[in-house]
């Protein structure tokens, strides 16, 4: 069945127009070449082969071309020996290949393209794995070297900058150290000067203290000497209110006036002679008072009231001086005593003594009624 179908297929082109008979039909020739190259067909004689090809619609030219291409034109069937009868050999069925249309060509091209693509892919993989590393290895090394050189240049620049900064900082630190040393030297000079000034001041202060001590001692000596030798006693005086008033007589008006003036004069004389220094310098007032007294009243004037008061005041002053001496002995630090304080103490002592004397004298001068009124007030 297959051989009949194959025989029918090449018979179809015979019904084509005459243009196809003129041109050789390559597919038919190719099938004829394959048919002639078959080992069984080659054993058959040429006449039978030609006759079979003509039956299939091949022309003589095409048959000749098929014989030339197949190379079986000189083939002759081998002698089978003497035979009485020739057995007709049936020609084998020609296996005619079907007519390949244009789609089969595209398939062949596609398969070829796929094969070429596979080969190209293989070459590409080989190129990537083996050839590229060999080619690009040197380039990468060069790039790495360039990178290393760039990094080294950057590092050298940064190191140079840091070195310059360190040099500037060291210079500034050295300047600061020099300034600090200068300040330390100035402070040392100032301390030495301060020590010298303090020593000189201390010496001056000690000298001043010694001078003050000597002055204080001299003042104490003067005070003690003044108090050891009491002032010269003055004549005793009697207040005016104790003097008996005599009746005035017309024969002696001057005496009355003088006696009335004598009542006032003792007060003035006493006020002028309030201080002990002044008492010694006012003897005239005392003589006046005693000159006015009569011979009967001289015995009463012997009573020295003022001397008693003065003795009492001197006793109190001596007690105070003893207390002050004890306090001075207890106080070791006499360096801070000022001359003004000493003078103030002296003035207070003087005022206290004189004031007490004056108060007692005034009490003696005043009458009892006046003293009571003053106490009530």
Curated annotation (Swiss-Prot):
Consequence of substituting residue 56 to A/E: Reduced interaction with PEX19, minor effect on interaction with PEX5
Low complexity bias spans: 1-15, 244-259, 265-275
Top-level lineage group: Eukaryota
Feature: compositional bias, Basic and acidic residues: 360-377
Modified residues (N-acetylalanine): 2
InterPro entries in the cross-refs: PEX14, Pex14_N, WH-like_DNA-bd_sf
Keyword terms: Acetylation, Membrane, Peroxisome, Peroxisome biogenesis disorder, Phosphoprotein, Protein transport, Translocation, Transmembrane, Transmembrane helix, Transport, Zellweger syndrome
GO cellular component, one term: cytosol
Cytoplasmic face of the membrane: 127-377
Segments of this protein annotated with the region Disordered: 1-24, 230-377
Effect the entry attributes to changing residue 52 to A/W: Reduced interaction with PEX19, minor effect on interaction with PEX5
Biological process (GO), any one: negative regulation of protein binding
Residue ranges annotated as Peroxisomal matrix topological domain: 2-108
Molecular function terms, GO-annotated: beta-tubulin binding; identical protein binding; microtubule binding; protein transmembrane transporter activity; protein-macromolecule adaptor activity; signaling receptor binding; transcription corepressor activity
Location of this chain's protein in the cell: Peroxisome membrane
Positions of modified residues (N6-acetyllysine): 34
Membrane-topology descriptor: Single-pass membrane protein
One Pfam entry name: Pex14_N
Feature: compositional bias, Acidic residues: 323-342
Transmembrane segments: 109-126
Purpose of the protein: Component of the PEX13-PEX14 docking complex, a translocon channel that specifically mediates the import of peroxisomal cargo proteins bound to PEX5 receptor. The PEX13-PEX14 docking complex forms a large import pore which can be opened to a diameter of about 9 nm. Mechanistically, PEX5 receptor along with cargo proteins associates with the PEX14 subunit of the PEX13-PEX14 docking complex in the cytosol, leading to the insertion of the receptor into the organelle membrane with the concomitant translocation of the cargo into the peroxisome matrix.
Family statement: Belongs to the peroxin-14 family.
Subunit structure: Interacts with PEX13; forming the PEX13-PEX14 docking complex. Interacts with PEX5 (via WxxxF/Y motifs). Interacts with PEX19. Interacts with tubulin.
Clinical note on disease: Peroxisome biogenesis disorder complementation group K: A peroxisomal disorder arising from a failure of protein import into the peroxisomal membrane or matrix. The peroxisome biogenesis disorders (PBD group) are genetically heterogeneous with at least 14 distinct genetic groups as concluded from complementation studies. Include disorders are: Zellweger syndrome (ZWS), neonatal adrenoleukodystrophy (NALD), infantile Refsum disease (IRD), and classical rhizomelic chondrodysplasia punctata (RCDP). Peroxisome biogenesis disorder 13A: A fatal peroxisome biogenesis disorder belonging to the Zellweger disease spectrum and clinically characterized by severe neurologic dysfunction with profound psychomotor retardation, severe hypotonia and neonatal seizures, craniofacial abnormalities, liver dysfunction, and biochemically by the absence of peroxisomes. Additional features include cardiovascular and skeletal defects, renal cysts, ocular abnormalities, and hearing impairment.
Name of the protein in question: Peroxisomal membrane protein PEX14
Organism: Homo sapiens (Human)
